[in-house]
Every structure is written in structure tokens, then in C-alpha cells.
Regions:
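Signature aromatic-anchored transmembrane alpha helix within multi-pass, membrane-resident enzymes
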Residues: 65-71, 279, 412-442
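Short hydrophobic/aromatic helix or loop-helix immediately within or flanking a transmembrane segment
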Residues: 96-103, 115-141, 318-335
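Short periplasmic/luminal acceptor-recognition loop of GT-C membrane glycosyltransferases, typified by
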Residues: 119, 458-498
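Membrane-interface micro-motifs in multi-pass membrane enzymes
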Residues: 122, 165-215, 237, 391-404, ...
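Transmembrane-helix motifs of polytopic, lipid-linked glycan transferases
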Residues: 145-171, 209, 354-357
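Membrane-interface helix-loop-helix junctions at transmembrane boundaries of multi-pass membrane enzymes
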Residues: 166-172, 257-272, 339-378, 388-391
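Hydrophobic/aromatic-rich transmembrane helices and adjacent perimembrane loops
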Residues: 199-206, 243, 340-351, 369-417
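Membrane-interface alpha helices of multi-pass inner-membrane proteins
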Residues: 222-239, 245-248
Length: 587
């Protein structure tokens, strides 16, 4: 008795298990003998009845359906993304990536002078941002368009991966289960994580492409080469690829080789894939080093480690809530009402993912499907890294959503059919569609409290300083006609730091910053530095404006001469670091 790698079921066979990759692949292919002609009651021989979904297998039909679905999803996700202002209150700071892509479009391909965060997104989202800006220019909607495009690709590629090589009814059910779980991100927490800044979200696109290559390609010499190149490409943009794809692939290949002993010549495919994954790590590091040596951007080393016992205990339920929020299923603090219906429906999707992961773990060592094994290990490793790590941000485990959805699509259709739950799942899918529509027609965000780019232009203010959470947004919204650069206070002095910034921004020989836009302390629970510190440092302003919740102070001098660059190395979020700065620049 062996597991069918295509359908997840059990078939009885007298054939011995094939030990090499080519033979295993041939065993996975449907043969003509598997579909004998059927003898009717009249004694005549008839060909087997074609599936009612066979028309979907025609390539041009499938391509057309996926293209149409992708367009519809993109429009819906774009509308939902616009319900959120430009994402600036987290290390991802999407406005910064927008400016980086704009700089690259204008010749600074290596981002010379830029100090990036611990995730560069240089090879993941930045090319996407460049494409959007090439078409639409620099404006606040770039973030929304890019986010909608990324998530559309995640849903479509995830559905394709879940389908695998299955055909007919089973292939359709696989596809719909995976797509349904990801279809309708919750309006608030889901939009904030999945349809905002590029913080590990876009990384899922190249990972899904890699898994599709592993799933669809025959075991040939070029597959490990392609996988190595794609893995290195993705790791240059985001080191989380090491946890989500590199380690799982190495672990699974090692397990498969151990479980199927024999000459290395017969295990060349698994050995090559594991080697390709390991080589990609070195290649990615080499590429980053070459970029830095050539005068390009510098990348902050990721803060990687285990949380302390006290922090782990304090953050456990917060992290559980974040995981549920990722799936739109968080019921913490829920008041019964219309939102409870949405959460209950999303809980069904979350339950399917938990069920699929449990099935995958239980049958892991007997599983013949390489991609299922890789995804099971990826899910477990990513969840463990998040729960035992130091960061409680939901962005750190975004991959759980597409990985879990694909596992549900590949492992549960047969079980759902046997339990006669297919009609129920159809109703749930329809509910997901309704929620997507409701989210898409929600009014777009509008922030009237902050001075607009037009206001600054009308007052002839084109270069100034501001708080980190609001500054770059003005620059993006104005198409860089008005440029406001991020700063923070340290010991009552206005300073800046090397995190998602370009050193040239603060060069007094290149720019003349003559104003500061600052949030009124009473509007931020008195967490903002008082405006009196600005007056004490720069002297009385020539003009002061009150615009909404902000104060704009204007001087007749260049403020950059008194804004030093400080460094907080080893800090997850240096813009809010409370300790003393580092003695030298971070490496």
C-alpha cells in the first residue's frame, strides 16, 4: 500500500517502491492502463466517462479563467488596500520603499547612500514598486497598487500549487479550498498586515514560484540550478526565506534519503536539491557583499534570537492573537454582532489549516509528495520561530497563511468528500466571496489631520524635517515636490539615524531644510516630544502654523547643520530606542 502523490489517497499496488527520482515521478504519472474502457450492459465496450470539469483542463480555458479571476481579485484587493493610509507605523515603512524604488528608477540602481532595515526587499517588492511607479509615477497610491498586486499573486499562485497535478473535480476542489482560505482578508488586521507595507508579504511570491517549480517540473538536472538561483534571489531581499524554504528543503531531502537508503547515484535529485538550497545561502551573502563593496546600500544585520522566559510568557497570548488575526479569526475582545459572523467564518478556514497541518505531520514520514513534506516543515519551523522569537509582529509569520492554505487544498479534499462536507464548504466559500465584496466597497481612508502636500507647496515649503511616522508620507504624496525627512529626539536634541534613510537627505551642502512639522503632544498621549524642545534647539521660529493635529514651525536658516546622525545597533526599532546610541556606525 502506497500513498498517491497526486491525490493524497491510498492505492494498493504490487509494484515495488521505486528508489530513484525519475522512477518515482513516472509512478506518479497517470497511465492509460489506469483508465480501462468500461463494458456496458449491452456488452459493448465504451470509453471512460469524461469528468464534468474536463473542460477546465484545456490550457486556453484555464489560462483565461485564471487571468479573469486575477483581474477581479486585484480590483477588489486594491479597493480594500485603499481603506488603509500609507503604512508608516512599523519598521516596514512602505513610504520608504516607495522612495527607494523611485531612486532606483532614476539611476541609483544600487541605492548608494541608503541604509536599509534588516529586510531589504531589494529583489522582492522593490522591482514591483518600480514597475508600478514606471506606470503611475510617485504618489501615495503606489503602496496600495503594489500590495494588491502582491496579494493577488499569492492567492493565484497558492491556488495553483494546491491544485498540483490533480485534474477534474479533485483539482477544482483543491484549488477552491486554498483560494477560499486566503480569499477575504479581514478588513482591519488583515488589511494592515496583508495589504499594506512590504514586510515579508511579497516574499511569498518567489517562494510560491519555487514550490511550483519543485511540484510541476520533472526530476531533471536543471531543476536544482533553477531552485538555487531563485532561492538566492529571494534571500537577497528577505532573510526569512532561510526559515521558510531553505531549511525545510534541506530537512525533507535528508529525511527522504535516510528513509530510502541506496547508492548516492539513485538519490542524486534529493542530494542536488539540498545542495542547491545550501549553496543559495552563500550566493545571497556574496551578492549583498558585492553590492556593499560597490558602494551600494548597507543592510542592518537581523536581530535573531530566542525570547526570554518572562517575555515568552507575557507575549504568548498576544502571539496567538496575531496568528488568529492573520487568518481573520481572532475572537479576543469580541463583542457579539456582525463582526462575529465574519470571524466565525474565518475560524472555519483556520480550522481547516490546523486539520491539514495535523494530517501532514501524522503522515510525514510515509508521505511520497515532496512539496507536501516541504510545506509541513516550513509551517512548523515558521510557527516555532515566531512563537519562540523576540518579535510579536504579525508580519513575521505571514507565510503561515499561504502555506496553510496550500496544505489544506492538497490534503483535505478527499476527507471533506468522505465526510460529506463539500456542500458546506461551498456555502463557506460563498460567504468568503461576500466578505471580499463588503471589504472592497468600504470607504477609502482619508486623513485630514495632517498638512497636505498642496498646503506645503502653497506656503513655499519644499524641504523640511518631521517625525518618522509622518514625514516620508508627505514626500510620497507630493511626488517628491515637497520633501520631509524623518528625525527623532535624543536627550532633547533633534537627531536622525541610519534606518531606511539616505545619508544625502541630511547633507547641509545639498539641501536647505527650513521647517519642522510636528504632531501636537496631546494628540499622541503625550508620547511626542514637546514643541518647546524644538524652540530651545533652533531658537524662536519665524512663523508657526497650526494645521489639524500638527504644528509647522518655519525658520530662516538651514536646520540640517544641527541634526547629527546617531546609531542604535542591535535594536529592532532604532527610531524608538531608549538606550544610549552606539559608538560607531552599524555593520
Amino acid at each position: 500500500v502506497t500513498q498517491s502523490p497526486d491525490h493524497g489517497g491510498v492505492v494498493t499496488t504490487a509494484e515495488p517502491e521505486l528508489s530513484n527520482a525519475d522512477g518515482a515521478e513516472e509512478a506518479a504519472q497517470p497511465s492509460a492502463a489506469a483508465e480501462p474502457d468500461l463494458q456496458g450492459a449491452d456488452g459493448a465496450t465504451h470509453p471512460p466517462k469524461r469528468s464534468e470539469f474536463a473542460w477546465l483542463e484545456r490550457r486556453w480555458v484555464a489560462a483565461g479563467v485564471f487571468a479573469a479571476a486575477g483581474i477581479v481579485l486585484f480590483v477588489a484587493y486594491l479597493a480594500q488596500a485603499r481603506t488603509l493610509p500609507v503604512h508608516l507605523d512599523a519598521p516596514s515603512g512602505s513610504a520608504w520603499q516607495t522612495l527607494q524604488a523611485w531612486d532606483m528608477l532614476h539611476g541609483n540602481v544600487l541605492l548608494r547612500g541608503w541604509s536599509l532595515a534588516d529586510v531589504s526587499v531589494y529583489t522582492t517588492e522593490l522591482p514591483e514598486y518600480m514597475l508600478v511607479e514606471l506606470i503611475r509615477g510617485l504618489n501615495g497610491d503606489v503602496v496600495h497598487v503594489a500590495a494588491a498586486l502582491s496579494y493577488t499573486l499569492i492567492v493565484v499562485l497558492g491556488a495553483l500549487l494546491a491544485k498540483g497535478r490533480a485534474t477534474g473535480r479533485e483539482g477544482l476542489i483543491r484549488l477552491l479550498v486554498a483560494a477560499g482560505i486566503m480569499l477575504a482578508p479581514s478588513l482591519h488586521s488583515g488589511t494592515d498586515v496583508l495589504l499594506s507595507g512590504p514586510d515579508h508579504t511579497g516574499t511569498q511570491v518567489p517562494l510560491l514560484v519555487i514550490w511550483l517549480v519543485l511540484d510541476r517540473a520533472r526530476a531533471r538536472w536543471w531543476v536544482p540550478v533553477v531552485v538555487a538561483v531563485l532561492l538566492a534571489w529571494a534571500q537577497v531581499g528577505d532573510a526569512i526565506v532561510l526559515v521558510e524554504c531553505v531549511l525545510p528543503l534541506v530537512v525533507v531531502c535528508a529525511v527522504r534519503m535516510y528513509r530510502r537508503p541506496g547508492p548516492l547515484a539513485q538519490q542524486w535529485y534529493e542530494l542536488s536539491l539540498a545542495g542547491a538550497a545550501l549553496v543559495s545561502v552563500g550566493v545571497a551573502k556574496l551578492v549583498l557583499a558585492v553590492i556593499k563593496q560597490a558602494g551600494g546600500f548597507t543592510l542592518r544585520s537581523p536581530v535573531i534570537g530566542f525570547s526570554t522566559a518572562a517575555s515568552m510568557s507575557a507575549q504568548f497570548w498576544v502571539k496567538v492573537q496575531r496568528v488568529l488575526e492573520l487568518f481573520g479569526a481572532s475572537f479576543f475582545g469580541l463583542t457579539l454582532g456582525h463582526s462575529a459572523i465574519s470571524i466565525a467564518i474565518h475560524l472555519i478556514g483556520f480550522a481547516l489549516v490546523v486539520w491539514a497541518v495535523a494530517v501532514g505531520v501524522r503522515r510525514f514520514f510515509g508521505e511520497s509528495d515532496l512539496i507536501v513534506q516541504v510545506l509541513v516543515v516550513a509551517f512548523v519551523l515558521l510557527l516555532a520561530a515566531y512563537m519562540f522569537g523576540t518579535k510579536p509582529d504579525a508580519n513575521e509569520m505571514i507565510g503561515l497563511l499561504p502555506i496553510g492554505a496550500v496544505l489544506a487544498g492538497r490534503l483535505l479534499p478527499g476527507r471533506l468528500s468522505r465526510a460529506r462536507l463539500a456542500p458546506t464548504m461551498g456555502v463557506v466559500l460563498a460567504c468568503y466571496g461576500v466578505m471580499l465584496l463588503v471589504n472592497a466597497v468600504h470607504p477609502a481612508a482619508s486623513d485630514q489631520s495632517q498638512p497636505s502636500a498642496k498646503w506645503f507647496e502653497a506656503h513655499h515649503l519644499t524641504y523640511g524635517l518631521g517625525q518618522v511616522a509622518d514625514s516620508s508620507k508627505v514626500t510620497v504624496d507630493s511626488g517628491a515636490r515637497v520633501q520631509v525627512r524623518p528625525t527623532r529626539f535624543y536627550n532633547h536634541q533633534l537627531v536622525t539615524t541610519s534606518w531606511q534613510t539616505d545619508a544625502s537627505w541630511y547633507d547641509a551642502n545639498q539641501h536647505d531644510a527650513n521647517f519642522v512639522v510636528w504632531k501636537v503632544p496631546s494628540t499622541c498621549a503625550n508620547a511626542c516630544q514637546p514643541v518647546t524642545d524644538l524652540r530651545n534647539e533652533f531658537g524662536p521660529p519665524a512663523t508657526t502654523y497650526q494645521v489639524g493635529n500638527f504644528i509647522v514651525l518655519v525658520w530662516h536658516k538651514n536646520l540640517l547643520a544641527n541634526v547629527p546622525m546617531l546609531y542604535w545597533c542591535g535594536n529592532v526599532w532604532p527610531w524608538n530606542a531608549s538606550g544610549p546610541p552606539s559608538a560607531k556606525a552599524c555593520s
